[in-house]
Amino acid sequence: MNKFKGNKVVLIGNGAVGSIYAFSLVNQSIVDELVIIDLDAEKVRGDVMDLKHATPYSPTTVRVKAGEYSDCHDADLVVICAGAAQKPGETRLDLVSKNLKIFKSIVGEVMASKFDGIFLVATNPVDILAYATWKFSGLPKERVIGSGTILDSARFRLLLSEAFDVAPRSVDAQIIGEHGDTELPVWSHANIAGQPLKTLLEQRPEGKAQIEQIFVQTRDAAYDIIQAKGATYYGVAMGLARITEAIFRNEDAVLTVSALLEGEYDEEDVYIGVPAVINRNGIRNVVEIPLNDEEQSKFAHSAKTLKDIMAEAEELK
């Protein structure tokens, strides 16, 4: 029996991130049905065939097909990976104008199908595009999720795990804020296998400089990867698959995603990366970590950066 029976995902955007996300869904049998939409119909046709050939080896049967926007009408989840890609030397915020125009069209097409599920947004700048998707769709805020800092937090945990020689799953540490240059680590609540990071650093003060460098590596990882191979895709695709799994399994899992704030962290009317409880209904609630003064100030700066960009966007006025 397929424990994910009835779970349908429509993927819009079959580039590197989208196609690897699609493979992750099939490989892990997270969905019952996967529909792929992209302007490049021939690539979709090829990927659908390739993915179908993988399904005999997936844990359960997954139906995969090429589709169109009308297929969204009974989808449980629409995942948007479409949009202009980030180029070397270009910040995520540089992509705003180009991708807002693309999203206005995409979300309009999806909603015209009578879609009544959850949106998951991965395209950059993800915080602004998640906000735009919420505005353009008219759906409740709980049903529009951005991938946020889920990848940044994974990078952060990985680097900390390597520094302390433990498994990444034994590290509890979050990156919050904009998925971009103004993001910040929540040092005050980071722990390694239950031991506060602050305590561990008191035992090895020479490690403080190394830890600070870990955040710089986390923040700048995308630029390094883009410079080396043109784009990042494996990590974010796995992050999207993890969010999808949390939704369909009704996990009440806490993940760092882009969510709308309505007073949490002293911020309003902005989608930004924060820990949130994810289940079958989307975002159950935002988890408000008590930040110290420095962290709160940096978070406010991150939120202001996003708000300032949105204030200039004609598509959001």
Swiss-Prot record:
It is found in: Cytoplasm. It catalyses: (S)-lactate + NAD(+) = pyruvate + NADH + H(+). CDD domains: HicDH_like. InterPro entries: L-lactate/malate_DH (IPR001557), L-lactate_DH (IPR011304), L-lactate_DH_AS (IPR018177), Lactate/malate_DH_C (IPR022383), Lactate/malate_DH_N (IPR001236), Lactate_DH/Glyco_Ohase_4_C (IPR015955), NAD(P)-bd_dom_sf (IPR036291). Its EC number is 1.1.1.27. One of its GO terms (biological process) is glycolytic process. Pathway: Fermentation; pyruvate fermentation to lactate; (S)-lactate from pyruvate: step 1/1. It comes from the Bacteria. It is an enzyme of class 1 (oxidoreductase). Pfam families: Ldh_1_C, Ldh_1_N. The modification Phosphotyrosine is found at Y223. Its main location: cytoplasm. The active site is at H179 (proton acceptor). Substrate binds at Q86, R92, N124, P125, V126, D127, D152, S153, A154, R155, T232. HAMAP family: Lactate_dehydrog. This is L-lactate dehydrogenase 1. It comes from Staphylococcus aureus (strain MRSA252).
